[in-house]
UniProtKB/Swiss-Prot annotation:
Entry similarity comment: Belongs to the IPP transferase family.
Alphabetical list of SUPFAM superfamilies matching this protein: P-loop containing nucleoside triphosphate hydrolases
The protein's required cofactors: Mg(2+)
GO molecular function: ATP binding; tRNA dimethylallyltransferase activity
Subunit composition and interactions: Monomer.
Pfam families, sorted: IPPT
Entry-linked Gene3D superfamilies: 1.10.20.140, P-loop containing nucleotide triphosphate hydrolases
InterPro entries: Dimethylallyltransferase (IPR039657), IPT (IPR018022), P-loop_NTPase (IPR027417)
Function: Catalyzes the transfer of a dimethylallyl group onto the adenine at position 37 in tRNAs that read codons beginning with uridine, leading to the formation of N6-(dimethylallyl)adenosine (i(6)A).
Binding site for ATP: G10, P11, T12, A13, S14, G15, K16, S17
Gene source species: Chelativorans sp. (strain BNC1)
Record's protein name: tRNA dimethylallyltransferase
Length: 292
């Protein structure tokens, strides 16, 4: 178990990475990514991963280490964090977890039940069926295979529906069985500091707009070209990064770059709003809610 860690959560563009870097430089620390999109190798600009200058200032872990062709889950992230701890890659350093994926922080502080390995063929088959049949049809199938899971998952939540169906097929047991297994946190709750940044709405909106404009100027279009060249299914998580769909439409001649920017900025604002709502309701009073 990791002692004395710092956890920094917050919505996109709230200044999390800058705060983490400041702390790491002051305390000879190492920064560990807790953002589900910043794990992907091709998506550097669109996910606002730290650049070369930031990477040179402090050690960074679990950034850009996953090919976008590979699915990546909360369970995989926890496994990667556990490997870092067991390999003593974080030993004798101030460890700072930073990101906007609330489920990662929940798993880190509350534990995550073990899940079975899902064969790649099973993943491909269910993602193909999702693309062909749609989420509502698969939700009906889940109602037959795992009624309890179906009652807990909205018909519109296609990612969780597919995950539950994959688990049933791969293990022969419903996902609720695995979720009921014992789990343990990876950080010592008595010695860690937990911070969630809560930015002013107008300030955040301005930051989001400015940041996406910078992404476009620095090569986001070329980044999307590289991603599209991989010919990935639209259901892959990396393909759902904000900006990918919008810039893809530009490359297809469907909309202008200005229109793509407007749409991506609006989508980012909506995403930040959902993040803030989640943090307010899911992160308890033991978290420092820090205005920025």
């Amino acid at each position: 178990m990791l002692k004395g860690a710092t956890l920094i959560a917050g919505p996109t563009a709230s200044g999390k990475s800058a705060l983490a870097l400041q702390m790491a430089r002051e305390r000879d620390g190492v920064i560990v990514n807790a953002d589900s999109m910043q794990v992907y190798s091709v998506l550097h600009l669109l996910t606002a991963r730290p650049g070369p200058e930031e990477l040179a200032m402090a050690p960074h872990r679990l950034y850009g280490h996953v090919p976008p062709s590979k699915p990546y889950s909360t369970g995989r992230w926890i496994s990667d964090v556990r490997e870092l701890i067991e390999a003593e890659a974080l030993a004798r350093r101030a460890v700072i977890f930073v990101g906007g994926t609330g489920l990662y922080f929940r798993a880190l502080t509350e534990g995550l039940s073990p899940m079975p390995e899902i064969p790649e063929a099973v993943r491909i088959r269910w993602r193909k069926r999702l693309a062909e049949e749609g989420g509502e049809a698969l939700h009906r199938l889940l109602g037959e295979a795992d009624p309890l899971a179906a009652s807990r998952i909205r018909p519109s939540d296609s990612q969780r529906i597919v995950r539950a169906l994959e688990v049933v097929e791969a293990s022969g047991r419903p996902i609720s069985y695995w979720q009921g297994q014992a789990s343990h946190p990876l950080v010592d709750m008595t010695s860690c500091r937990k911070i969630v940044l809560m930015p002013d709405r107008n300030t955040l909106a301005s930051r989001i707009e400015k940041r996406f404009d910078q992404m476009l100027r620095h090569g986001a279009v070329e980044e999307v070209k590289q991603l599209l060249a991989l010919d990935l299914p639209p259901s892959m998580p990396a393909m759902k990064a904000i900006g990918v769909r919008e810039i893809s439409a530009v490359l297809a001649g469907e909309i202008s770059l200005d229109e793509a920017g407007s749409r991506a900025i609006a989508a980012t604002r909506q995403y930040a709003k959902r993040q803030i709502t989640w943090f307010r309701h899911q992160l308890g009073p033991d978290w420092e809610h820090m205005p920025v």
